[in-house]
A protein has these predicted regions:
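Patatin-like phospholipase
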Residues: 1-7, 12-110
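A short alpha-helix-loop-beta-strand transition element characteristic
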Residues: 111-117
Length: 117
């Protein structure tokens, strides 16, 4: 049996587009062609990979629908916020350019029912 891996990249809106690409593949390809043995990702792709890993083989279309709903909800939230003291505060005091608490809260809420695999 062949071992297929699905690697999901990161980068701004790319993670959002992965849901549409996965939905398109799931609706046009035979389930045996869609079968993969491993899934991984970085940044937003890792969020998608964790969500996808919680769906059994053959339910990639359902996983893609969930991804789309999740990323649609992110559009109403500014996921990264500036520090009150600006970039200087971020670099000198906080250890990062932006306050990422909003993205952490969003991921925690959206992935609350996803179990680690």
């Amino acid at each position: 049996m062949k071992c297929y891996a699905l690697a999901l990249s990161s980068g701004d809106q790319n993670s959002m587009y992965q849901a549409g690409a996965l939905k398109g593949l799931a609706s046009t390809l035979d389930a045996s062609v869609m079968a993969y043995s491993a899934v991984s990702g970085t940044q937003g792709g890792a969020v998608n990979a964790a969500l996808l890993a919680n769906y059994p083989a053959g339910q990639e279309g359902d996983a893609a629908d969930r991804m789309k709903a999740m990323w649609d909800s992110s559009a109403s939230t500014r996921l990264y916020k500036d520090w009150l003291g600006g970039l200087a505060e971020g670099l000198l005091i906080k250890g990062g350019l932006w306050n990422d608490k909003a993205v952490l809260d969003w991921v925690t809420t959206e992935m609350a029912d996803v179990s680690p695999t």
